Amino acid sequence: MPRKAKVAKDLMYYPKWKSRKKNRCPICGRPRAFIRYFNMCRICFREHALRGDLPGVRKASW
């Protein structure tokens, strides 16, 4: 729980320059591998997609 509280606190902080702002996953707080279109990291995206929580997203097969 402390990690989520820290992420929430960091999101309230406005950096001195806009370029310093880092996109973070609102679910787990991960700063890397962020997918802007879905506003979550790749790991959370995969979990939600496999569960069927994201409409129109399906596993690719060819």
Curated annotation (Swiss-Prot):
Which GO BP terms apply?
translation
The keyword Signal is annotated on this UniProt entry = no
| InterPro entries reported in the protein's UniProt record | Ribosomal_uS14 (IPR001209), Ribosomal_uS14_bact (IPR023053), Ribosomal_uS14_CS (IPR018271), Ribosomal_uS14_sf (IPR043140)
What is the required cofactor set for this protein? Zn(2+)
Which of this chain's residues are annotated to bind Zn(2+)? Answer: 25, 28, 41, 44
Q: Cellular component per GO?
A: cytoplasm; ribonucleoprotein complex; ribosome
Per the record, the domain of life is Bacteria
GO terms (molecular function) for this protein are: rRNA binding; structural constituent of ribosome; zinc ion binding
Q: How is the cofactor bound?
A: Binds 1 zinc ion per subunit.
Which keywords annotate this record? Metal-binding, Ribonucleoprotein, Ribosomal protein, RNA-binding, rRNA-binding, Zinc
Under Pfam families, the record lists: Ribosomal_S14
What family is it from? Belongs to the universal ribosomal protein uS14 family. Zinc-binding uS14 subfamily.
Q: What does this protein do?
A: Binds 16S rRNA, required for the assembly of 30S particles and may also be responsible for determining the conformation of the 16S rRNA at the A site.
Subunit composition and interactions: Part of the 30S ribosomal subunit. Contacts proteins S3 and S10.
Annotated protein name in UniProt = Small ribosomal subunit protein uS14
Organism phylogeny: Bacteria, Pseudomonadati, Aquificota, Aquificia, Aquificales
